[in-house]
From Swiss-Prot:
Major role in the synthesis of nucleoside triphosphates other than ATP. The ATP gamma phosphate is transferred to the NDP beta phosphate via a ping-pong mechanism, using a phosphorylated active-site intermediate. One of its GO terms (biological process) is UTP biosynthetic process. The active site is at H117 (pros-phosphohistidine intermediate). Belongs to the NDK family. InterPro entries: NDK-like_dom (IPR034907), NDK-like_dom_sf (IPR036850), Nucleoside_diP_kinase (IPR001564), Nucleoside_diP_kinase_AS (IPR023005). It comes from Aspergillus fumigatus (strain ATCC MYA-4609 / CBS 101355 / FGSC A1100 / Af293) (Neosartorya fumigata). The gene is ndk1. This is Nucleoside diphosphate kinase.
Length: 153
């Protein structure tokens, strides 16, 4: 187990549907700590860089267009194994394959409107955080609930 950070984004459909609060609650209730958050309308170039690994896919242009369609709630969460556990909280990329109780299992139907993005590895989390946030935007703080969430520091 390691203490790490992950990048989580609530996509335009999630923002438009008023899901920012419920999604934040899922991460807070699990015991993770929010260290950065902003509502942004990123430029196309930033989205193309974020999804560069998908640039050869037929759905790439549609994905970028969809991500440009409204504001995105960009966040950085911190905690033990937050990358892997965060992906579990989000559910499978295809909402129809997501278990009930996951964000996508509860709030999404179509893969093209799957509400949120989460880093898939610690390495990618670092890249995504650097793409979306300046270092000074990440706030270092100790949650009052830390000792109630973690047995050992």
């Amino acid at each position: 187990m390691s203490n790490e950070q992950t990048f989580i984004a609530i996509k335009p459909d999630g923002v438009q549907r008023g899901l920012i609060g419920p999604i934040i609650s899922r991460f807070e209730n699990r015991g993770f700590k929010l260290v950065a958050m902003k509502l942004v309308s990123p430029p196309q170039s930033q989205l193309e860089q974020h999804y560069a690994d998908l640039s050869d896919k037929p759905f790439f242009k549609g994905l970028v267009s969809y991500m440009l369609s409204g504001p995105i709630c960009a966040m950085v969460w911190e905690g033990r194994d937050v990358v892997k556990t965060g992906r579990t909280i989000l559910g499978a990329t295809n909402p129809l394959a997501s278990a009930p109780g996951t964000i996508r299992g509860d709030f999404a139907i179509d893969v093209g409107r799957n509400v949120c993005h989460g880093s898939d590895s610690v390495e990618n989390a670092k890249k995504e955080i650097a793409l979306w946030f300046k270092p000074e935007e990440l706030i270092s703080w100790k949650s009052a609930t830390f000792d109630w969430v973690y047995e050992k520091a």
